[in-house]
C-alpha cells in the first residue's frame, strides 16, 4: 500500500534549531539540510506515495516560543518571505525553464557566528550542471561538489563547498552557474558592510479602491548587490502619501526580526491615485516604492 508521509521536519521546543532570522546562520542552513534529506528519502522508494513537509510559513501557536507564541517551522516567515530552508524547493525545476543558484548561507566574515566565513560545509541549492565559485578574483580553493551520497535521489541535489576564508579584507563572492556549457546565472555577494543599504519592494503595482484590496511592502537590510543581510539594528520609519492605509508596525524594529520586515497597504473606498512609501533608517538610508490605486469597476477574474 502506498505510504504518504506528512509533517516531516517541523520544529519542537526546546530545540537547538528554531529557524528564526535572528538565529545563527548554521541553524537557518540546517533547515534546508533537513528538508533535502527527507525528500531524498521519500524519493528513494516507490512505495512512498509522497511527502508533505512542515511547514510553509511560521505561525502563531500557544505551544510556540515562550513570550512570542510563534512556531518557527516555516520555510518562509510570517511575512511570507522565503528563508534559506526554501532554497531546496526553489531549485527543483528544469534549468531551461528557470536557472537557479541560491546560497544557503550569508556571506559575512569576521562576525561572532562566522569568524572565517560560512565554513567547510557551505550549502548551495542549484539546478545548474556546473558551478564555479570565486572569492575576489581568484577561484575558491574548494570548488562545488554535488553531494550525491546524501541527496542522490533528488533531481537537482544541493552542492557542498568549502568557504573557509583566512584573509583579512572584505572580498566579494561570485557564483556562476552553467548549463550546456553556457553561463546562465551569476550571484554576487559582498562581505563589506560599508556598502549595506535599505531595500524595499511592493508586490503589486496596482490595487483597487474597494477598501479591502491590499498589497505587501517588504523592506530589508541588503548588501551592495541586493542580498539580504542577516543582521540589522534600529528602526525603520515609514512615510505614506496617497489614498492607502498602512497595516502593520510603524516604526518597525528591524533588529528584533533579523534585518527585514513587512507591512501591508490597503486601499480606501472610492479613493484613487498614486501612493508613495518612503522608508528611512538611521544608517541604511532611504528606500522608496510607488503604486497606483485604480477604480475597481468590473474586474475580470482570471
Question: Can you name each region flagged by the protein language model?
Answer:
Residues 109-117, 206-215:
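Short, solvent-exposed loop/linker segments at the N-terminal edge
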Residues 189-212, 295-302:
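Low-complexity, Pro/Ser/Thr- and charge-rich linker/hinge segments at domain boundaries
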Residues 181-193, 285-295:
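Edge beta-strands of extracellular beta-sandwich domains
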Residues 156-168, 252, 256-270:
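Short, hydrophobic beta-strand segments
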Residues 168-172, 212-214, 270-274:
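Extracellular Ig-like/FN3 beta-sandwich strand-entry sites
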Residues 147-154, 242-258:
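Low-complexity "stalk/linker" and mucin-like segments enriched in Ser/Thr/Pro/Ala/Gly
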Residues 1-182:
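Extended substrate-binding grooves/exosites of carbohydrate-active enzymes
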Residues 120-126, 212-230, 275-279:
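Beta-strand-rich structural segments
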